[in-house]
């Protein structure tokens, strides 16, 4: 399923409790998207969230139902960083030089 990074800007600090988390999960399940990970800014007013979703529109539908912003939605891919590290160490040999 495609990956999307969502930037959300909030007027007040984000404080998610267990009930809020359950509501997010329920709506995400109904819409067919999966919240994978989030970063929260130091001032707790901005999040960057990684989602799997069939489309950008599915993310927007869930955001509207949850009454949360989805200011920027960017389709993203991944960079296999660990593969590069493994290749580097393999080329260096067991002594590390």
Where are these regions (language model features)?
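Short, well-ordered beta-strand segments in beta-rich or mixed alpha/beta enzyme
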Residues: 4-8, 37-63
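An amphipathic, aromatic/His-enriched active-site/gating alpha helix that lines ligand/cofactor pockets
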Residues: 30, 53-79
């Amino acid at each position: 399923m495609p990956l999307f990074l969502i930037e959300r800007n909030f007027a007040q600090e984000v404080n998610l409790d267990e009930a809020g988390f359950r509501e997010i999960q329920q709506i995400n399940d109904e819409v067919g998207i999966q919240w994978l990970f989030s970063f929260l800014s130091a001032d707790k007013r901005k999040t960057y969230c990684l989602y799997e979703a069939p489309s950008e529109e599915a993310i927007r539908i869930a955001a509207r139902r949850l009454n949360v912003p989805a200011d920027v939605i960017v389709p993203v891919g991944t960079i296999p960083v660990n593969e590069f590290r493994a290749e580097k160490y393999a080329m260096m040999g067991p002594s590390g030089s």
